[in-house]
Structure formats: C-alpha cells, structure tokens
Regions:
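Glycine-rich phosphate/ribose-binding loops and adjacent secondary-structure elements
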Residues: 59-67
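Conserved nucleotide-sensing/catalytic segment adjacent to the nucleotide-binding pocket
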Residues: 7, 12-59, 72
C-alpha cells in the first residue's frame, strides 16, 4: 500500500498554519514508489518499505517482491488515483483505476441523510486507534485537515477512476458501534 511509502514524519514540512498536512501528496515518497514500480514491471525483485506509524518513519523488514508472469499490481491508498504516481512510460491501457469509498445510503428521516463523511470519520477513528497507536482525540482534532486534504488531493482524482466501488454496507453502523462507542464515550467534552 501507499502508506508504506510515507516519508519519515520528521522530514515533513509544516504548512502555513504550522501544522503537518499529512494528507498532502508530498508526504508520499513518489520518486521511490515510481522507481519500485518500474523495477517490478521490468521483472526485477524489489525490497518494499514498511512505514511504522508508532515510530513515524520508514523501516525495512526485508520484504521482497518479484512479479510472476501475468501478475497484477494493486496499488492501494488515498493517493492511488493521483497521476503523479505513474511513470510516464506506462501505457494507459495497462492501468485499471478503481475508486473505493464508503458511500453510506442511509437517511435519518425523509429530509436528513447521514453524510458519508461521518462514516469515514468513524472508520478512521477506529483504524487509527487500533492500528496506528493514535488516541481518539488526535484523530478528531485532525479531521478538519483530513477533509481539506480530501477536497484537494482525493476528490479531484476520483473522476480518473474507471469504476467506483461503494464499500459501505447497510449494517455497518451497527457493527462499528461496538468499536467506536467506548472510544467516543471516553473522550472529554
């Protein structure tokens, strides 16, 4: 996934507001990603990086990959549709782009729908807490920046997708409640 190509957190320059913009495309080592992708497509073995969210830096674990004949590469991550990731010499007909998002189809009543951003926030809060060692308060305080990043770096490229896949399920809020409720009730108002 593209998360493993994050640059070390201490090398990220703060934005005009003095805060780190972790949604910016420049947080991804696009040069290394393109280099590794070209080597994989050329049939070479590549040692893939791994990003430690606990340490805030890239680590090398010796995970090597070499494609078999007729293999498919799946690039997963927020910036996967951004054209800057693809080397110019990759033929467009060899690339199939899929935009995956939780497009929740639920309404509170006849006039008020549940915004898709709510489900994304709930998902991210649980993910950050369980897999990135991030307190709930940190995720909540970053949400405005995340949404700015979506508007600037994600949504403009969804039109590049060949297909859009809705990853939400009708019962998801009921399932996620078990995980999110204890986290949110522990947050100080």
């Amino acid at each position: 996934g593209l998360d493993d190509y994050y640059i070390d957190r201490d090398k990220i320059l703060p934005g005009p507001d003095g805060k780190l913009d972790l949604e910016h495309i420049n947080t991804i080592d696009t040069d290394l990603f393109r280099h590794d992708l070209k080597r994989l497509l050329a049939g070479e073995e590549v040692e893939l990086p791994s990003f430690s969210f606990k340490l805030g830096k890239r680590v090398w674990k010796g995970h090597k990959l070499k494609l078999e004949r007729d293999s498919v590469i799946i690039v997963e991550g927020l910036h996967a549709l951004n054209p800057v990731l693809l080397p110019e010499d990759i033929a467009p007909n060899l690339v199939f782009r899929m935009y995956v998002s939780a497009l929740i189809p639920l309404n509170l009543d006849n006039h008020n729908r549940i915004p898709t951003s709510y489900l994304r926030l709930l998902r991210r809060t649980v993910r950050d807490y369980e897999t990135r060692n991030s307190p709930v308060q940190r995720t909540l305080s970053m949400w405005a920046s995340v949404q700015r990043g979506e508007r600037r770096w994600i949504f403009p490229y969804q039109e590049n997708a060949d297909v859009i896949f809705n990853s939400a399920t009708l019962y998801e809020l009921a399932v996620i409640k078990k995980h999110i409720y204890p986290l949110l009730t522990a947050v100080e108002p």
